[in-house]
From Swiss-Prot:
Its EC number is 3.4.11.-. Disulfide bonds join C324-C328. GO terms for biological process: proteolysis. GO terms for molecular function: aminopeptidase activity; metal ion binding; metalloexopeptidase activity. The gene is lap1. Glycans are attached at N120. Residues 19-90 form a propeptide. Residues 1-18 form the signal peptide. Keywords: Aminopeptidase, Disulfide bond, Glycoprotein, Hydrolase, Metal-binding, Protease, Secreted, Signal, Zinc, Zymogen. The lineage of its organism: Eukaryota, Fungi, Dikarya, Ascomycota, Pezizomycotina. This is Leucine aminopeptidase 1. GO terms for cellular component: extracellular region.
Amino acid sequence: MKLSTALVLGATATGAWSYAIPQLEQEVLELPETHYEQQEKYLIELSPYQTRWVTEEEKWALKLDGVNFIDITEDRNYGLFPTLDAGSYVNYPQKMGYVDTVKGLIAGLSMDNMRKDLENFTSFHTRYYKSSSGVESAQWLYDQVSKVVRDSGADKFGATVQKFDHSWGQFSIIARIPGLSKKTVVLGAHQDSINLFLPSFLGAPGADDDGSGTVTILEALRGLLKSDIVAHGQSPNTIEFHWYSAEEGGMLGSQAIFSKYKKNQADVKAMLQQDMTGYVQGTKHAGQKESIGVMTDFVDPALTSFLKNTIVTYCAIPFVETKCGYACSDHTSASKYGYPSAMATESTMENSNKHIHTTDDKISYLSFDHMLEHAKLTLGFAYELAFAAL
């Protein structure tokens, strides 16, 4: 996830951000002629249809300045936020229909599981998507997801866990729990982390960004598969859990997945992204009530309304509306390819974790009680839509 930060390098972009593009031009010095290897450049989009070619170093400079972007180099000809097809509008339930069942499943969610998983997940030096340890962490996560599915017995009824390979090394992960139709509900988080100062060398435990979201939806998957109806493939709709690679590089992994889904005409009815689910200190220091942040910009309004209803029904804390700006996480990719998306996070943006993208994004700053509330909403969201007439 991209957040504003005070950790700004001298070479970062400057200028206010209100859909104005920070200037990256540098003074040209007269130096002796020297032949340099040309740096690879990437096409990024900083707001709808506002693009720029940048080097990788310029990418990180923008992120340090709190500037969001999506890297569209691989699919630059696809229009962003296209008009949904006439038949693709989704009517989400106006009220929850399976409260007793979902609350029974919620009772089985475990903070101990999330803590253990996050301790292991943050033990890798970095989960930077181009690093060898980023591949190792992805393999560890794949093994955990596979074990959850096997232990539930869902694999005997068609459930699968697949690696979605990418050119940069770290793969994305897709757990698919088939239903009676191909109408699909996606729950997502990103698995990569980054240290913006020297991504290839410095540590990036990424406990909150987005280790917290990763283990939150993993625990929700455990809880969901305790339903025999779901595990046995008898829910009306299909449920998928995604762990995306390379979100920090500009939503690269999620774009690749939703691009393929669009080409294959996948019938995705809803996508919920969970990015940073564990930090509450900022909210408490501000003297505000602990809440779940619900994004209201660049999301689907109807799905966001359903998300709010889910929180009110299944969580012990309220929601608070907030905005993260353009291209702040992987729900952007779902929207880009015409799929309805929503996003939940730990707080309002101004109260969110400022330790991210450094070596200091540690478990010690996080609240597993708060992460449990996010797991509750994830489980409720998934189960209710698994049985909804979408």
